[in-house]
Amino acid sequence: MAGMKSSPSQDEEACVLAIQLATSTVLPMILKSAIELDILNTISKAGPGNYLSPSDLASKLLMSNPHAPIMLERILRVLATYKVLGCKRSELSNGEVEWLYCWTPVCKFLSNNEDGASIAPLLLVHQDKVPMKSWYHLTDAVLDGGTAFNKAYGMNIFDYASQDPQFNKVFNRSMAGHSTITMKKIVETYNGFEGLKSIVDVGGGSGATLNMIISKYPTIKGINFDLPHVVGDSPIHPGVEHVGGDMFASVPKGDAIFLKWIFHSWSDEDCLRILKNCYEALADNKKVIVAEFIIPEVPGGSDDATKSVVHLDAIMLAYVPGGKERTEKEFESLATRAGFKSFRKVCCAFNTWIMEFSK
């Protein structure tokens, strides 16, 4: 283009990146197959530092296709390129070279941990045919207004999930795995639950989050607050009372109110309605504990944390009317506008930030 000059080496690098971006659907779809084939769990079970060949893997997975080892090799190569797996060269007795593959820290989070939780279901839900269809409507949403998912299905993703049992199962499994991993880290890292007599989890679903908190702090009374049809099917947890209601109408009283990944699904106006109800439910000097992703003020960051939250913001753009990830300043503004006297960013757990809004 006129006025834009670059060196041959810069052109080489830029064109290679453009080609990588043009083929970027490869990685999530390869990961999807690796998860469905149980490749990552199988390699993780071998343990750190223990390597498997494609033939070993095909044998462990009981694959009858004679071409499976060759096909697995090509899948494993992609995963090793993105550091999902480690690899090393091995020379066979006949002089041929074989590549062996092993566990990495990234693989740890994409395979089942000791609690049976994994980030893998989160990947599967975003590659599922249901939400994938919405991306084909994003251009129209930008041009005409509205949300891509609603244009694809005539309703929002939450209403759709309630009508599609199979997708609802995939969706709930993805949220449960991500939540379990993140909450375990929050409970280990954040000490703001200490000394509380009671805590209300707004939008707490089945009560699993409160159960993790109260397992560490058994003297706290937990109130799991969600829509009546949600809490009506929730399991019994020691120290947890299930309460049905609408967070846009009122919120139960407690020493603290906890909201995890709630605000990114709502517009600023809706967030303010929720926060004002939380404010009314708290005594003076009590707090709302917010767990959310924080998007950087300045675009263009290339670190993994920034890429992750920018991806999530784009997902909100496509799936949820009014939903978005927010900057620290935007959270502070919401707290101030809702009447809270102080805002504090406390700590981070796997890119989810804990913030306190104090009355």
UniProtKB/Swiss-Prot annotation:
Designated name of the protein: Bergaptol O-methyltransferase
Family: Belongs to the class I-like SAM-binding methyltransferase superfamily. Cation-independent O-methyltransferase family. COMT subfamily.
Any one Pfam family match given in the protein's UniProt record, by short name: Methyltransf_2
Catalytic activity: a 5-hydroxyfurocoumarin + S-adenosyl-L-methionine = a 5-methoxyfurocoumarin + S-adenosyl-L-homocysteine + H(+); bergaptol + S-adenosyl-L-methionine = bergapten + S-adenosyl-L-homocysteine
Taxon lineage: Eukaryota, Viridiplantae, Streptophyta, Embryophyta, Tracheophyta
Regulation of catalytic or functional activity: Inhibited by Cu(2+), Ni(2+) and Co(2+).
Encoding gene per record: BMT
Species, as recorded: Glehnia littoralis (Beach silvertop)
An MF annotation (GO) of this entry: 5-hydroxyfuranocoumarin 5-O-methyltransferase activity
Binding of S-adenosyl-L-homocysteine, residues: 179, 203, 226, 246, 260
